[in-house]
Amino acid sequence: MKNTNKNNVNRREFLKTGAAITAATILPRWILGGAGFVAPSNKVYIAIVGAGGQGRTNADALMREADAEIVAICDPSEDADYSPFYYGGRAGRLPVKARIEAHYTKQKPDFKCKEYEDFRVMFEKEKGIDAVLVATPDHVHAVVTAAAMRLGKHVYCEKPLTHNIWEARQIAKIARETKVATQMGNQGHSGEGIRMTCEWIWAGAIGKITEVHAWSDAGGWAKGPGRPKETPPVPKGLNWDLWLGPRDYRPYHPAYHPYNWRGWWAFGTGAIGDMACHNLDPAVWALKLEAPISVEASSPGVDSEVVSQCAIYRYNFPARGDMPPVKVTWYDGGLRPERPEELEEDQVLGGGGNGILFIGEKGKIMCGGWGGTPVILPQSRMDEFQKPPKTIPRSKGHHRDWLDACKGGPQPSSNFEYAAKLTEIVLLGNVALRTRKKIYWDHENMRAKNAPEAEKFIKETYRKGWEVA
């Protein structure tokens, strides 16, 4: 539903009707929440910012929801070849626009999806959009997300929520102020596996947990050291300066766009930023983790420009209520924890190159990637375990929950308050890696007690016109 004065009038008339409500009535958010909330019976009109592989994937997911309509697509790149990469095929605003129009013209033959290079121009012209899905490279997440929320738009932002810790705090603050519906794109958070893991742990399935190991084989997107020396021409249809966004100008190189930006500190956050929002998520939720006391990281090589090919990160978290202190270790780039002796010979550690392992006083819980398919080790303990009641509300789907929130339903479970905390924990690991120090973290003041040089990684600088505000 587009934001129109008619809806405001309807809301005022409803509130003036004494027969409609009593003092004890609880009204849905779409009535009380102002023009930003969409009536449950209406469509949610959405703009997508970022039309790469993940933007295309999100568009497909939204097109499966009957009450969502993608009305605008924005990306500095018209068209790019993703066939050498995970996503395959082509992406960019023109291929994704064509995909969107092919879908909606089946119901509305005259349907047209608007296209834009610059999200700021789109926000100025497309006043009727209700919500924004952000699937840009990491370094632009916070800039677009903050601007959209300030305009009263509901926002779904891909993970990690931000590129640095200061941005995570700002985005959480703006979300609290604007009260829009928010969701980060760590899709496993809406899965059954992560809910089962939490419920089992809270029921004492493996007793007190003092150690967690999580991992992903992801990594190795860029090769260093330093920036590329070559300066090839910018491909036709790519606005390179716009793609750089808040970052200082540097010459175009295919090592950055369309895919391998993940391996450059200026644009990406490495494998831990890309995958720990999935695979560490069960630990943060189940163990009620907040700020760590300290974090340290090690890697065969640390470069000022290129993300390490592989690394290990070690976090120390304090006790939380009746939960004891816990050590959390993250591995990426093919590094793994030691294989548990309780695993059967034919059992895989985790699943698909990803996983998480909880070590408790009475046993272990192992999950695959995204917190999926939890099992208790050893198998004998799994066989005798009486599964507890399902106490966590089940999700209808990651995008579905967000759309329902846009219509006045409850905030999704990976809303920006939670997502900012998870993102901050993840990104603090990169601060330790880049400073090459064990960081003692002052959470309240957002600083590394023993490493003033970490400040430039905690809060980055921005080109004029690209500030997070």
Predicted regions and their residues:
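Secondary-structure transition/capping motifs at alpha-helix termini
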Residues: 65-68, 173-181, 203-207, 287-291, ...
